[in-house]
Amino acid sequence: MSLFALGLNHKSAPVNIREQIVFAPDAVTAALQHLRAHTTAREAAILSTCNRTELYVRMDDRAPEMLGEWLARYHRLDPEWLRDYLYLHEGAGAVRHLMRVSAGLDSLVLGEPQILGQAKIAYQGAIDAGTMGRVLDRLFQHAFSVAKQVRTDTGIGANPVSVAFAAVTLARQIFDDFQNRTALLIGAGETIELVARHLREQGLKNLIVANRNLERARQLVELEGGEAIPLSEIPTRLPEADVLVASTASPLPILGKGTVERAVRKRRHRPMFMLDLAVPRDIEPEAGNLDDVYLYTVDDLREVIAENRRSREEAAHQAEEIVQRQVDQFLSWRRAQQAVASICDFRERGHAHARELLQRANRRLRCGEPPERVLAWLSHTLTNRLLHAPTVGLREAAEAGDRERIELARTLLQIENANEDTRESVDKEQTGTTQGAARGDQRSTG
């Protein structure tokens, strides 16, 4: 069984591809159970955000191609078409990838803290679905520890440039100031809350928040000021908006081209800045073809964010060192767990031989055979049983000239160097014991 991380993100696939591979929060449990039922996955978790969709799986190491095919078919897509956008990490690579993701080192905004919360949601989702096992549990706990240590021990979180801040920076390319502007924010999650805060800090006075859950919108405007409205009122209030930012979890667009076109006419073609941070998108892409509409997606924030990444390169280097240490620690634990399983199997095989031979020895004693002879037979036969496999392995290694395997066996079996006389003595003793035991065996069976 190996660990795999398969997925696509903002670097491997544009938004029009990513939005087709999103798992809605209420669909994760069913998806994980379907994944385990239709592949060789033993443990699984799904991390799905606007910038990435990833599967973390412990499964048969001969079948990782199952994951890409399952992901495509689950979303009713062609596996061959999707393959060009996917990446696959195995073993240590999968461990390192989750740790880097959780620490914000693989994010669009380097060091952004939101991804850690999203990773914790993925972890809880696997627990709820019953697909979180001992190995993945340990891996996620290590990843959370890495994220905390990176933020504590490096400067990667200092003066952060969030997606929300980058959104407001992009809007300033259209409007010099926000004092006399109106912003319509669709959604009421953490990103929208941060956008509202940054807009207020830039002097925006008129703020409208639309959300499916009106109470949540009201809670947000209580913090930042403004007016809360239901989604149904968006078409009538849209003409007021100079700035529109959308970030919901809706599976279908909330704003169509026709609605935007009518709003632009009512605005008498005053420019409208629109930023769609959602994946799948909240605004029909065709709306961007309208005159006076400046429509951007989350992928358009790259240049704004690039400066942030350059300023944090030293902190990122320190963070990568922390990640590598934690990767080594996890892999050490993993190897120890695999050794424990081998030790248990090895000891159980020895006990099974002992139980079988003890039963046979008792039968011989009941038949009146001298105890000394039975004990000699038991000792010899049990020794042969236990040493047969190592002996065959050593002989094969010797015939192949594999000195490394021979030395490893000597270390594992704690074999001291013996001179030739000792070896000959041991050989003679074993030969005599073998012959005596064989004669006893023949008499007992006869």
Curated annotation (Swiss-Prot):
Record region (Disordered): 417-446
Gene3D superfamilies reported in the protein's UniProt record: Glutamyl-tRNA reductase, N-terminal domain (3.30.460.30), NAD(P)-binding Rossmann-like Domain (3.40.50.720)
A Pfam family of this chain: Shikimate_DH
Basic and acidic residues: compositionally biased ranges: 420-430
Oxidoreductase found in the keyword field: yes
CDD domains membership: NAD_bind_Glutamyl_tRNA_reduct (cd05213)
Recorded superkingdom: Bacteria
GO biological process terms, semicolon-separated: protoporphyrinogen IX biosynthetic process from glutamate
Active site positions: C50
EC numbers on record: 1.2.1.70
A Gene Ontology molecular function term of the record: glutamyl-tRNA reductase activity
InterPro entries with a match to the protein in the record: 4pyrrol_synth_GluRdtase, 4pyrrol_synth_GluRdtase_dimer, 4pyrrol_synth_GluRdtase_N, GluRdtase_dimer_dom_sf, GluRdtase_N_sf, NAD(P)-bd_dom_sf, Shikm_DH/Glu-tRNA_Rdtase
Site residues by UniProt (Important for activity): H97
Catalytic reaction(s) noted: (S)-4-amino-5-oxopentanoate + tRNA(Glu) + NADP(+) = L-glutamyl-tRNA(Glu) + NADPH + H(+)
Additional remark text: During catalysis, the active site Cys acts as a nucleophile attacking the alpha-carbonyl group of tRNA-bound glutamate with the formation of a thioester intermediate between enzyme and glutamate, and the concomitant release of tRNA(Glu). The thioester intermediate is finally reduced by direct hydride transfer from NADPH, to form the product GSA.
Entry text on domains: Possesses an unusual extended V-shaped dimeric structure with each monomer consisting of three distinct domains arranged along a curved 'spinal' alpha-helix. The N-terminal catalytic domain specifically recognizes the glutamate moiety of the substrate. The second domain is the NADPH-binding domain, and the third C-terminal domain is responsible for dimerization.
Subunit relationships: Homodimer.
Protein's UniProt name: Glutamyl-tRNA reductase
Native source organism of the sequence: Alkalilimnicola ehrlichii (strain ATCC BAA-1101 / DSM 17681 / MLHE-1)
